[in-house]
Amino acid sequence: MKSLVNLWGIYPFIRNNSLHGFAKIPRIVSTIPRQLRFSSLRHPTRQMDLIHDTVVVENLNTFAVVGQDQWKRKEPQPVQIDVYMRNNVQLAGEKDELKSTIHYGIASKLLRKEIEGSFFTTPKDLVNKIASLCFEDVIDTSHVSIKLTLPKCVLRSKNGLHYYAERERNSTSNFVDRIEFSDLELATILGIHAFERQEKQRVCLNISFANTEVEALEIARAIAEYVEQSAFLTIEALVVNLSKYLCFTKNLDDISIKAEKPSAITFANASAVQIYRTRSYFLQESLHKYESTKNKIAYLSFGSNIGDKFEQIQTALSMLHKIEGIRVLDVSPLYETEPMYYKDQPSFLNGVCKIETRMSPINLLRACQSIEQEMGRIKTILKGPRCIDLDIVLYEDCVYESEVLTIPHLGLQEREFVLRPLLALSPDLVHPYTHQPLQEALDKLPSQGIRLYSSFDNKKIINGALTMGILNVTPDSFSDGGKVSQNNILEKAKSMVGDGASILDIGGQSTKPGADPVSVEEELRRVIPMISLLRSSGITVPISIDTYYSKVAKLAIEAGANIINDVTGGMGDEKMLPLAASLQVPICIMHMRGTPETMKALSIYEKDIVEEVAVELSSRVEAAVQSGVHRYNIILDPGFGFAKTPKQSAGLLGRLHELMKKPQFKDMHWLSGPSRKGFTGYFTGDASPKDRIWGTSACVTASVLQGVSIVRVHDTKEMSKVVGMANAIRYVP
């Protein structure tokens, strides 16, 4: 393949600021074979037999439709043509006559006649037309070099688009054409000084690259958008990152960029940086950079649509934990998604995990493939059904391509089922070579109908809030103490389930303000027999154990409970969060300060209550994640009535959606527990907890309309009806 990669210096029509600086060399030099070009200049008499003469037509002006003009219209636009036609002028020079050479006047007329007013799809089509005319008998050259200029083609360019090409008659040589944008004038934030960060300044760009399948004007627009949205400190960073961005987003093999900063030096025209980069350079650089044994951060996507999808994912994550050189740092919520490419297959369960690893990208790929193979994945249909799928989505800021691996993942920016879980883990992630925030990419996608998955409702998809019925087996509960015992709990549980409870919450210790704690042994005596009785009697709905003792939680799960509901968010027992992680069960983490004995005195919020609750609850989520709890197993509770005055609880409920939309809580499930709380009676005038059903109804409605997944209530029959109506208001089209 003959390439124009080193275009600067090959042709006489290259700009004066060319890399090799030979713009003023006599034109006859331009077509000397490349390997002899410089020696021929030093010793012209030794290589005269190798010199190829040219006849030149410069700046031939005409007009034609060449693709789109600067306003994206298919309208005629000015065209300037430079043609360098190879021809031995020796005989014409000796005889001083025209018949032995190319008649440039005839050539000019022929070119104008055939081109003027014609329609060409691309600049390359026009170049091919010019070459074919030059090879005809009228002109009869065997080799032609062409510079095509469209001065009005690029909206932000002072001198438009230049297209450089070389053609040979009857040749199978695959010449690589080049495109240049000349004097692109853009504005961006650029500089290290404070005053340079306050206002955009002009930059002037000259960019050339090998012709590509991507439309040139699309590339020009991408350049303008990238540069004007950037805010680099140095011009070096601008050109390096721009070249990387274009190589990968526009599939360019190579690129040359010169960037001038006219306002940089008071007594000079401009400061400038000029670079040449290739796609392969970036790939090799990235690969070398990440071959070290230092720990790196990577993100893996996972999915399953065969068998018990949830269990398949749990198994794959457990296997990932056990691989030496990999540490799982965080796991996203889970999402059910319809198949995107091959449609005739079951829906998928998808998510993303964040890992720390010393492995290179290739070795990490092999580790993922080993898990797939061990779990029995068999690839039969491209993008078809699979028991497990593990892909490297991101690996630090690595850009890598090979026959077996591409990083970032090729489908990253078009897949909601990858972007959403990815951003749930790291909301501020940017694309490695576009530097576009991934949140912007997600915002641009049309909804792909993915649904948040629930690990606490018998592993179903939630289509609205669920009702959690409260079964307190405590003698001193603030609302219903002493009303549930082993004699009536089964009847009570069946009644709640029949009335609409999707989850039962069993508690053996009062957490009302001022309540004294009971011992672990006493709480175990109260709750374990109850859970065992319910399970042995055929109660199948999920059971939540309301406790902050890890031992109680462990034995309750072994007895048949499914969920841990810890009002202290793991602060009451340091073993609670690691226990939830090891058991791989959902845990509800509530916002609370102090203990039930002390929390009333801790209701002072110096700043905005939503912001303070967000910070404190976020710290508990982080503690859970660091303990190994996966985000899909975390349920959050704002803690109405706990270390909050009635007005604070009501205000927090009214702004619950603000708390839920914080980036650190993206797509997490929420529980609301306002039932019969003091603040509901404070505003309705109901002193007795059993009379607070109307205030509770209003709070439940407000909670559901703001998107909570669970409401925890005493009056199951009435509140299930309220939840049903609120779900209809929020979710029914």
From Swiss-Prot:
Q: Where is this region: DHNA 1?
A: 55-167
One of this protein's Pfam families, by short name? FolB
Give the region (HPK) as residue ranges.
Answer: 295-454
User: What are the annotated disulfide bridges?
Assistant: none
Q: Which GO terms describe its biological process?
A: folic acid biosynthetic process; tetrahydrofolate biosynthetic process
Give the keywords, sorted. ATP-binding, Cytoplasm, Folate biosynthesis, Kinase, Lyase, Magnesium, Metal-binding, Multifunctional enzyme, Nucleotide-binding, Phosphoprotein, Transferase
SUPFAM superfamilies per the record? 6-hydroxymethyl-7,8-dihydropterin pyrophosphokinase, HPPK, Dihydropteroate synthetase-like, Tetrahydrobiopterin biosynthesis enzymes-like
Q: Where is this region: DHNA 2?
A: 179-277
According to the UniProt record, where is the region DHPS?
467-733
GO CC terms in record: cytoplasm; cytosol; mitochondrial envelope
Reported EC number(s) for this entry are 4.1.2.25, 2.7.6.3, 2.5.1.15
Q: Which InterPro entries match?
A: DHP_synth-like, DHP_synth_dom, Dihydropteroate_synth-like_sf, FolB_dom, Folic_acid_synth, GTP-CH-I_C/QueF, Hppk, Hppk_sf
Which PROSITE patterns does its entry note?
A: DHPS_2, PTERIN_BINDING
Q: Which reaction does it catalyse?
A: 7,8-dihydroneopterin = 6-hydroxymethyl-7,8-dihydropterin + glycolaldehyde; 6-hydroxymethyl-7,8-dihydropterin + ATP = (7,8-dihydropterin-6-yl)methyl diphosphate + AMP + H(+); (7,8-dihydropterin-6-yl)methyl diphosphate + 4-aminobenzoate = 7,8-dihydropteroate + diphosphate
The cofactor named in the record is:
Mg(2+)
User: One GO molecular function term?
Assistant: 2-amino-4-hydroxy-6-hydroxymethyldihydropteridine diphosphokinase activity
Query: Which CDD domains does the record cross-reference, listed alphabetically?
Result: DHNA_DHNTPE, DHPS, HPPK
Keyword Metal-binding appears in the UniProt entry: yes
Which compartments does it reside in? Cytoplasm
Role noted for this protein: Catalyzes three sequential steps of tetrahydrofolate biosynthesis.
Name of this protein:
Folic acid synthesis protein fol1
Q: Which organism is it from?
A: Schizosaccharomyces pombe (strain 972 / ATCC 24843) (Fission yeast)
Q: What is the lineage of its organism?
A: Eukaryota, Fungi, Dikarya, Ascomycota, Taphrinomycotina
Q: Which gene encodes it?
A: fol1
